[in-house]
Amino acid sequence: MLILSRKVNEGIVIDDNIHIKVISIDRGSVRLGFEAPESTLILRAELKEAIVSENQKASVCVDESLLENIKKVIKP
């Protein structure tokens, strides 16, 4: 992990097309501004974690024996 110190109005550039700028620092909260191509997905970490969690809940693990029983019922 790269750790950088930045002051208000300072920023960093990632891969020539993603610009991150420190907008403000107030009471332990940092506001960041992002400029990136529209095709770049930018999410807060907690939102990304929630999406991953919901996707895991939505995925279904099917028992192999159940599939075999279905194959017996549906004969070509």
Swiss-Prot record:
Pfam families: CsrA
Recorded GO MF terms: mRNA 5'-UTR binding
UniProt xrefs under InterPro entries: CsrA, CsrA_sf
Main location: cytoplasm
Gene Ontology CC entries for this record: cytosol
Keyword terms of this UniProt record: Bacterial flagellum biogenesis, Cytoplasm, Repressor, RNA-binding, Translation regulation
GO biological process, one term: mRNA catabolic process
Subcellular location: Cytoplasm
Keyword Metal-binding: no
Family, per entry: Belongs to the CsrA/RsmA family.
Assembly: Homodimer; the beta-strands of each monomer intercalate to form a hydrophobic core, while the alpha-helices form wings that extend away from the core.
Purpose: A translational regulator that binds mRNA to regulate translation initiation and/or mRNA stability. Usually binds in the 5'-UTR at or near the Shine-Dalgarno sequence preventing ribosome-binding, thus repressing translation. Its main target seems to be the major flagellin gene, while its function is anatagonized by FliW.
Name the record gives this protein: Translational regulator CsrA
Lineage of the organism: Bacteria, Pseudomonadati, Campylobacterota, Epsilonproteobacteria, Campylobacterales
